[in-house]
Amino acid sequence: MRATRPLLFFILLLSIITHLSAQTRNPFYEPMSGKDRWVDSVFKKLNKKEKIAQMFFIRAHTDKGKAYEDSIQTLIHNSRVGGLVFFQGGPIRQAVLTNSYQSVSLVPLLVAMDAEWGISMRLDSTIQYPYQMTLGAIQNNDLIYQMGKEIGKEFKMLGMHLNFAPVVDINNNPDNPVIGYRSFGDNKYNVTAKGLAYMRGLQDQGILVSIKHFPGHGDTNVDSHQALPVLNFTKERLDSLELYPFRELIKQGASGVMIAHMNIPALDPTKNLPSTLSQPIVTSLLKGELGFKGLAITDAMEMKGVVKFFPDGEADVRAVIAGNDIIELSENTKRAIKLVKKAIKTGRITRERINQSVKKILEAKYWAGLNNYHPIDTTNLLRDLNLAEALSLNQHLTDASITVLHSDSLLKALDPKKRTAIISLGVTELTNFQKDLKLKIPNSMLFLMSKIGSATDMNAMLKEVKKYDQVIMAIHDYRKRPQSSLDYNTPLKIFIAELAQLNTITCVFANPYTIAGIPGIENSKSVLVTYQNNDEAQRSVVKILTGQMPAMGKLPVTINSFYKFGDGLDYFPEPKPVLGKTSY
């Protein structure tokens, strides 16, 4: 069965392309009525320095106080930058500041955010959609498309135009310190299908994307925020694996690609040269060989992976030379603009090179509606960012991701009338999962154990739990990057192995790689994986355990010899008599 999975996912990819292609807006670089006229009129009004500044996007927070906000407004007014990237803060504060910043900008700003799981990645009081690893388990990719559209709506409510998402890195290294849960998984076909659905949802809603991190950051063991990763793979390997999702999404009209800070000798042998600064990678490979016509966007230019070997603004200059259109988050934007201007005078950069990028940026602004800019209306904004239909979709996404491994024998046989032990591990207080499940199975007892509990307490609990007819064990871990480990003490790991040998259903509320660090989990009667430890996941599992919904998720990654990519039962429950109260 496993030998046929790549073929099945390829067929799935073709089907999703066919399904979505008829629904998409044309990319910004395709002909549009009135676009050339507006672009030319704006372009002609810009002086040489202002044209350079259009390529630079600056950082903006909404939680750093008035002095900081005034400094950003001054930089926008004086330097004439092309856009900004919002980070931490609140939605109302961001909307008010966006209106203020736009009011002093010569050309309407292209407003971006790194919002892989929605704007809650940066803003409080908003909906957090599932991580991409969770989405990788979903079999109905239309749900991911709908999520992309919902996130697109949120962007438009906040006057934003560009999402630095989706991540299309193939996470084939479980110890990856920077991607991991941000990836759809370790299968190139699944990553591509999911990435395409997310991209289409955003672009159909009128939001630009930036698929990342080109040419593929999934098999690294160095965080490019801190140092320069080196990818020592052949061109053939890169072409067949890492580049695959980028190639396919570019064919389908990706509006932007973010270039990673990595040294890749097979693509450019220059020592210590990040891919962001490589003309062979950005211009020859991305724009030439892959035919990309959208916005080439650097990863943050303040990261150590790019400035370590090219300090004092040299990285900014080289990023322009390499062929990037948008230079985001320079260490010093004013200095960078001056250095690029100097590089033009000395012949390192041609004026035509700048003009190409500026016109492309203006085309993207036109596509995003900035030719007809309107300030954000903050009336009922917080309510509109948390509508019932969006919250419902968020729960449906989690519902669709839950994966049943090993067997569904006890799931089908679970009897709400029998004495049931409901155990949560790795916590210090009763979980919502336990409280909700007890409402449905009143003939139950709740137990918990912290991740540093004593062996004496565990032995006493084990003796008590053995008196029960059936056991539901929940393993809780909030870590995003477990790297194939479970950070429980040794006695608790032994305790898990002993509990698994009882008549036990094990529920893993954690990143799937955590399973590799859970001893004896394969001895459980059934294993449920949720990918995250949040309220949505706990609600989903309660519904599955009590026969209220099926479980259809598949593992998006290979964990170990027991559990591999694509594993997961299609579990359809038989209706169970629910004795307790209904909380849904």
In which residue ranges do the predicted regions lie?
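Bacterial Sec-dependent N-terminal signal peptides
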Residues: 1-27
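Preference for extracellular/luminal or secreted protein segments
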Residues: 22-58, 62-74, 288, 310-584
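Second-shell residues forming the walls of enzyme active-site clefts
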Residues: 47, 68, 84, 92-109, ...
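Loop/turn elements at helix/coil->beta-strand transitions in domains of secreted/extracellular proteins
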Residues: 48-54, 79-84, 105-110, 156-162, ...
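Short acidic, glycine-rich surface-loop motifs adjacent to enzyme active sites
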Residues: 53, 73-89, 174-175, 250-273, ...
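Short glycine-enriched loops at secondary-structure junctions
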Residues: 61-64, 113-121, 161-171, 211-217, ...
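Acidic (Asp/Glu)-rich catalytic clusters
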Residues: 73-78, 98-106, 250-251, 461-466
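A substrate-binding/cap region within the structured catalytic cores of diverse enzymes
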Residues: 138-160, 167-183, 188, 195, ...
